[in-house]
Design a protein with these regions (language model features):
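Cysteine-centered metal-binding/redox modules
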Residues: 1-97
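Flexible phosphate-sensing "switch/lid" loops adjacent to ATP/NTP-binding sites
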Residues: 93-271
Length: 271
């Protein structure tokens, strides 16, 4: 890989896209693995290998500017193998130069069914087609339609569809950290970060869950996604102006504030 030229996007590879559709494929394996940088990965448990460094959702070395810079610096420095101590210094240098927080945009709706999901999906596809790494995000979704990720976590079906539009080959629970599944009689099962967390009434959800685990999960997911993607396309829920839950609404403006997102309001002209 060091001796060859920049590979570009190798669509003929049977594993493409391993990260996002327009990824730079020069480095099939990251020369910095395991970097153990919390901005780019996390420790995970492997059934076969025990504790490993998991960077499934790290796109850093597959960005064209990063791959080009690292390729040139590896050649110039004479680094030829993974054990070279100069790799650690090159990693720090590269991260300082290129790592940046992803830009967030929030799609809000004047009402439910205004078209937020369709607009968010379209923006994901447009940004992906332009060569950016992009991910969808919806902090809180109420739906009985869900999908299971490759790691066994449950997320809403629409976020899974948006991930496909964004070119994300392996979506994680981070794109939908809170999934509410209505059970009737005012109760919902809450799936937190892909795992069932209990049944809540509407009152208990907003008074007990949202201020603690709900807000914490929202911030963890936003930090995770913004550290790994160029763009985070966020989708709100219902209307951002429901005054009865405004102070405890983590699906709309509070999520937008946490991500410092620009907001687009979708309005159904029939209303």
């Amino acid at each position: 890989e060091i001796e060859g030229e920049l590979a570009g996007t190798n669509t003929s590879c049977p594993y493409h896209p391993s990260h996002f559709r327009n990824q730079e494929c020069t480095f099939c394996y990251c020369p910095f693995y395991p970097c153990e940088d919390p901005d780019l990965g996390e420790v995970a448990e492997s059934p076969r290998l025990g504790r490993i460094w998991d960077c499934t959702h790290c796109n850093f070395i597959h960005r064209k500017d990063v791959a080009s810079y690292v390729h040139g610096r590896l050649r110039a420095s004479g680094i030829s193998g993974p054990g070279d101590p100069a790799l650690e210094e090159l990693f720090r240098e590269t991260k300082t130069k290129f790592h940046r927080k992803g830009k967030a945009v929030m799609i809000l709706g004047a009402t439910s069914d205004a078209g937020k999901s369709v607009i968010a999906t379209a923006i994901c596809r447009i940004l992906n087609d332009r060569g950016y790494s992009v991910t969808p995000f919806k902090s809180q979704n109420m739906s009985l339609n869900s999908r299971v990720t490759h790691k066994g976590h449950e997320i809403s079906m629409i976020q899974d569809l948006q991930a496909r539009a964004a070119g994300v080959s392996r979506p994680s629970f981070r794109i939908n950290p809170i999934l509410m599944k209505p059970k009737g009689d005012g109760m919902s099962q809450v799936v937190l970060e892909g795992v069932p967390a209990g049944d809540y009434s509407s009152a208990d959800y907003y008074s007990e869950f949202v201020p603690g685990p709900g807000t914490d999960a929202l911030k963890r997911s936003i930090d995770f996604l913004q550290s790994r993607y160029d763009f985070v396309v966020m989708e709100g829920a219902g209307s951002p102006a429901e005054i009865n839950i405004y102070d405890s609404d983590i699906a709309n403006m509070r999520a937008a504030e946490a991500a410092d997102a620009d907001c687009i309001l979708v309005v159904n002209v029939e209303w």
